[in-house]
């Protein structure tokens, strides 16, 4: 088991900012199309984080053209170029799955005061 722990520790990223559910983030994802690669930005609200260590993931939700889009990213994935925290949200839950049923201003999250 100690060998697996050392391999896991080596593949953890150290450049991940501190973010939690309710925060609005920009995830810069590296997209490879044939021989070309480009960076695509996915901006939305973090609705939850799951797991720990190498297998930790987070789910980001945004509304694009009146259609809700959710995307789950591994936190320590090499596909992620970097994560940028836009705003901090003031929420009382760890999982914000109730946002899936809300529309318009009801789906808005209060900004945390600093």
UniProtKB/Swiss-Prot annotation:
Record GO biological process: translation
Xref: PROSITE patterns: RIBOSOMAL_L19
Alphabetical keyword list: Ribonucleoprotein, Ribosomal protein
Role played: This protein is located at the 30S-50S ribosomal subunit interface and may play a role in the structure and function of the aminoacyl-tRNA binding site.
Cellular component annotations (GO), alphabetically ordered: cytosolic large ribosomal subunit
Similarity section: Belongs to the bacterial ribosomal protein bL19 family.
Protein name, per record: Large ribosomal subunit protein bL19
Keyword Ribosomal protein (UniProt): yes
NCBIfam families linked: rplS_bact (TIGR01024)
Entry-linked SUPFAM superfamilies: Translation proteins SH3-like domain
InterPro entries (alphabetical): Ribosomal_bL19 (IPR001857), Ribosomal_bL19_CS (IPR018257), Ribosomal_bL19_sf (IPR038657), Translation_prot_SH3-like_sf (IPR008991)
Superkingdom, taxonomy of origin: Bacteria
HAMAP family hit by this protein: Ribosomal_bL19
MF annotations from Gene Ontology: structural constituent of ribosome
């Amino acid at each position: 088991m100690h060998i697996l722990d050392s391999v896991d520790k080596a593949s953890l990223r150290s450049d991940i900012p501190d973010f939690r559910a309710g925060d609005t983030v920009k995830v810069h994802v590296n997209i490879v199309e044939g021989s070309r690669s480009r960076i695509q930005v996915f901006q939305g609200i973090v609705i939850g984080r799951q797991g720990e260590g190498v297998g930790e993931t987070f789910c980001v939700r945004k509304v694009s053209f009146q259609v809700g889009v959710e995307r789950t990213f591994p936190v320590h994935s090499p596909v992620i170029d970097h994560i940028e925290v836009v705003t901090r949200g003031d929420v009382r839950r760890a999982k914000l799955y109730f946002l899936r049923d809300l529309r318009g201003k009801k789906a808005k999250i209060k900004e945390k005061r600093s």
